[in-house]
Amino acid sequence: RPMEKLTLKGKARFYEFANETPELLFTSYVGYDASLSTRGRASLPYEYIKRSGGVEAGYEIIPQARASVGYLREGISRNHREVEASNEDIYSGTLDLRPAHWVNVRSSYVHSERKTDTAKYHPHFFEESFPEGEAVTNVAMSLDELRRFDVYNRRRDKVELTSQLSPIDKVDVGMNVSFYEDDYSADYGLQKLWNLGWGIDVMYTPIPRLTLFGDVGQENGRGEMESRYRPVYSNVGYDSLNNDWSGALREKFENYGFGFSADVWPQKLTWGGNYGFSYSQGELLSTFAPGGNSNGDAASFPNVYYKLHRVGSQLSYRFTGQTAVKFEYWYEKYIQTDWAIDPVQPFTN
């Protein structure tokens, strides 16, 4: 703390995920839920090391306002991935406001850039899972960019606004809204991704021994992707620009929940319950048909839907200040409508 209103922070973190799962060799397997392949296939135990370090500087403008800026660098080393090493630079800015004793508002902006270490880029790592080699001999068939969107070069911008309100002693209200944009520098696979989300949570304590709470939120995503249809003739992949196609992704996620917590026996027995419902919808709108426009308009994939109901109850009893037991029960009901999975039947040779 070099000055009364200025604070400096530094942080560093090391995390290693060591995957000790043995490598397995499958002499035959069912491909695409349709046919039996006798070409050997090996599993690739994925593991990584993540290192990060950064600094943050904060300054109190006035007692009701504080601003801060930060920088974080994150490096990841991976095993069994096309991108064995990548680094990401993350820049952030935050403004905290407290216009009244019952209002807290935070606005933030984050810009990050992830870059691949080109010296440690192996686009054909996937061949390691085929000890005998892949059946298709044309290297262009792999379109490895489709397999690395989560680790390849990416630029991200994110803005977020959160607030915490306590208009009266018995009520707390939290609100947030966020938007981010991802831009991937690849010719195929995921190109761009946009996401807009918001959420509200409310907590109400009508009496000291009872608390009621609820929340609602929604996220809407939109993306662009490029791919290529790659037919196989005589065990050789056919690669042509005329077979490129593009698609637009649309995703919507909704979440609702409510519950309660009650002190049945003050400082001894507590009982709570809650219910949550989640709903999501996914669309893939094709905008270009393989083979060129002469083949006609592209056909979009059917929508995909997911629903999750979750009901829970918790009961805890405290014997002493340091000893307690807790019992929980959860019931979940999951429903999905997925055109790619619904008609699949068990394979028989």
Name what the model sees in each region.
Residues 1-349:
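Gram-negative and organellar
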